[in-house]
A protein has these predicted regions:
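Amphipathic alpha-helical dimer-interface segment in Rossmann-like NAD(P)H-dependent oxidoreductases
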Residues: 17, 54-58, 93-113, 150-151
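Rossmann-fold cofactor-recognition segment
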Residues: 32-47
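Conserved mid-core segment of classical short-chain dehydrogenase/reductases
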Residues: 50, 71-88, 131-134
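Catalytic loop of short-chain dehydrogenase/reductase
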Residues: 90, 110, 116-154, 167
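N-terminal Rossmann NAD(P)H-binding glycine-rich loop of SDR-like oxidoreductase domains
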Residues: 9-18
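Active-site loop of short-chain dehydrogenase/reductase
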Residues: 62-64, 109-123, 155-159, 203-206
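Catalytic Tyr-X3-Lys loop
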Residues: 80-100, 117-118, 142
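C-terminal helical subdomain
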Residues: 155-158, 162-163, 170, 179-212
Length: 212
């Protein structure tokens, strides 16, 4: 399969690329930084994202999956200390990049025999704490957009789903804090396994809870 992974230079992206590549798929890693062999694309530039979609189609003829793993977090101790510039940043990272990739890749996913799209969301979207106001609002907006995208895919073989975590953990975090147990966190390798499992289900417009 031909699978695009955005945010591919981050811990979750690296785990997804590693898993999907090991399974024999052609994975196109995309990241703003261009680090670790990824394609350097600014996902806040809609025209650049449209060009990415056109380039993928020209080179591979199709796309079987788009896994959007661009993330970010900003928070505060109290609601009153919330910084609106943090809210704006999170809107850019979590919502605008999502809007651009779904609008650009929708035709390719619809044309695929089994196209899959997914984002990672957080429990904070459904039950935000006061210090997570900006983050929870951005995640909730991203979920709403993804569910609308899922509705647009109804009647086609393609699906769009939301993978829900409390938070993610990776080996670097464990090495930095060997005494922490990270209760309720989802390992990025387990997330990668869940991503690969999307092609084994026809579920569409579903919030898949990885915390249970």
């Amino acid at each position: 399969m031909i699978i695009v992974v955005t945010g591919a230079a981050g811990p979750a992206g690296k785990a997804a690329v590693r898993r999907l590549t090991a399974s024999g798929h052609t994975v196109i890693g995309v990241d703003r930084t261009g680090a670790d062999g990824t394609l350097a694309v600014d996902l806040l530039d809609h025209e650049a994202v449209r060009k990415l979609a056109a380039d993928v189609q020209a080179e591979h003829g199709r796309i079987d999956g788009l896994i959007h793993l661009v993330g970010g977090w900003r928070g505060s101790k109290t609601f009153a200390e919330t910084k609106l510039e943090d809210a704006a940043l999170l809107h850019d990272l979590l919502v605008r990049t999502l809007q651009h990739v779904t609008l650009a890749f929708e035709p390719l996913l619809k044309a695929s025999g089994r196209g899959r799209f997914a984002i990672v969301s957080a429990k904070a979207a459904e039950r935000p704490t006061q210090g997570n106001a900006a983050y929870g609002a951005a995640k909730a907006a991203a979920e709403a957009w993804t569910l609308a995208f899922a509705d647009a895919l109804e009647g086609t073989p393609a699906t769009a789903n939301i993978l829900v975590v409390k938070a993610l953990v990776h080996e670097g975090m464990r090495a930095a804090s060997p005494d922490k147990t990270f209760p309720g966190f989802t390992d990025v390798d387990d997330l990668a396994a869940a991503i690969e499992g999307l092609w084994d289900t026809d579920a569409n417009g579903t919030r898949m809870d990885l915390t249970t």
